[in-house]
């Protein structure tokens, strides 16, 4: 009887191991070897192509790979929008692999439309997902003057972002 409980316990813990492993960075992800913003081209929700060379200059750049139907992504967008006044010196690049209509609905819902410091759309060449190899969304990469500061594999804590941006 005791062996059955021990075996069941081992199976239970073994079942959780793959879930924990999914949150660890892919050791071959290119961003681990290159700390600069990668070359990319995003089709924004207004149909314009935006590349890394054309993006507006801000002190910080925050690249977020998201899915419009992801609850954690919705929370992230809501928090960033709630504290938008703290992020005036940050360019947000929201990239999704989903269809443009879903991305537009997300942008409207979370007030990400017509903001000078927000680019939201789709990377048709999957350059950003290939560079970061996110295991889940939202995946957040924060840069200062084009150099990688920090990566958040499971979404960023807005208050931590604010502290970094404010230099605290």
Q: What is the predicted role of each segment?
A:
Residues 1-27, 168:
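Bacterial Sec-dependent N-terminal signal peptides
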Residues 38, 88, 114-118:
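A short helix-to-beta-strand connector/capping loop
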Residues 64, 93-95, 119:
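Structural recognition of the beta-strand scaffold that forms the well-ordered cores
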Residues 74-111, 127-130:
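Structural microenvironment flanking redox-active thiols in thiol-disulfide oxidoreductases
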Residues 110-141:
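Short, internal strand/loop/helix patches
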């Amino acid at each position: 009887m005791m062996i059955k409980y021990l075996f069941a316990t081992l199976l239970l813990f073994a079942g959780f191991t793959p879930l924990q492993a999914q949150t660890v960075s892919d050791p071959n992800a290119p961003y681990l070897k290159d700390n600069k913003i990668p070359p990319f081209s995003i089709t924004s929700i207004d149909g314009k192509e935006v590349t890394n060379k054309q993006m507006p200059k801000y002190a910080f750049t925050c690249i977020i790979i998201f899915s419009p139907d992801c609850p954690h992504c919705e929370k992230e967008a809501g928090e960033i929008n709630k504290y938008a006044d703290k992020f005036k010196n940050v360019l947000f690049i929201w990239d999704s692999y989903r269809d443009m209509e879903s991305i537009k609905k997300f942008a409207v819902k979370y007030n990400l439309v017509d903001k000078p410091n927000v680019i939201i759309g789709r990377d048709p060449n999957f350059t950003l997902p290939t560079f970061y190899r996110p295991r889940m969304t939202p995946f957040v990469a924060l840069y200062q003057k084009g150099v990688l500061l920090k990566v958040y594999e499971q979404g960023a804590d807005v208050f931590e972002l604010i502290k970094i941006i404010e230099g605290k």
